[in-house]
């Protein structure tokens, strides 16, 4: 469901990027120093970091599958309130994993496409399914009836994605670009409330995208500290600033206010915090630079 959108609040990512950055992949998200390729003959060994990231995503998708199977049972049992409460929590695993999960476009369409994006691409609502199809029924029709077949299909589609992920080669470029793409997700859809248009549970997705980007940063942290300790300190501060803001909107240790309950001042503060985080995050590409001789 992540169609090309006007990249709100991320122009700064272009300004801090290096002129030697490669052209953006896929749907035209921010081109930054994070996407610079490493010369084959002078490549920094990041094999442990890439292996650890793949393991992290595989664990997230395992959790997604298990939780979605339980969600499907709630829907079949007609437990509307429980299903509504579980829905945004389940989705967080997918949102954290998007740098890899979204690279399989066919699976992303089946699992996570919004109605607006599906209709724009296919000119019809017929065939639309996945999390957001179920979301629409739960919140617009206020029932679990009609969700059962979509739930079964969703479980099968996640199983298919799980199998695909085992085949992917994770590169430093995928991780670096993925961290920026996760912030673009926040800037283009979470900030505007477009992601969870029926349930208004966008803050869960917002947090998960930030967590996904932060995981990439944490995996690179040891080597990044050797390159630029000041950059690491800045990233720590900016991640904390975003997370502290999100904490203000939590109603308990897991759940968040509806996005529609936030004021314009609230969303402005979140947008500014994401923009400030994007500046140093886009500089993580220095980790791929060989040490000076």
Residue ranges of model-derived segments:
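Residue-level signal for mature regions of secreted extracellular proteins and peptides
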Residues: 11-12
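Bacterial lipoprotein signal-peptidase II cleavage site
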Residues: 6, 16-34
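Mature extracytoplasmic or organellar-lumen-exposed domains after removal of signal/transit peptides
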Residues: 33-293
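Positively charged n-region of N-terminal signal peptides that target proteins for export
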Residues: 1-4
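Hydrophobic alpha-helical segments and their boundary regions
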Residues: 6-8, 67
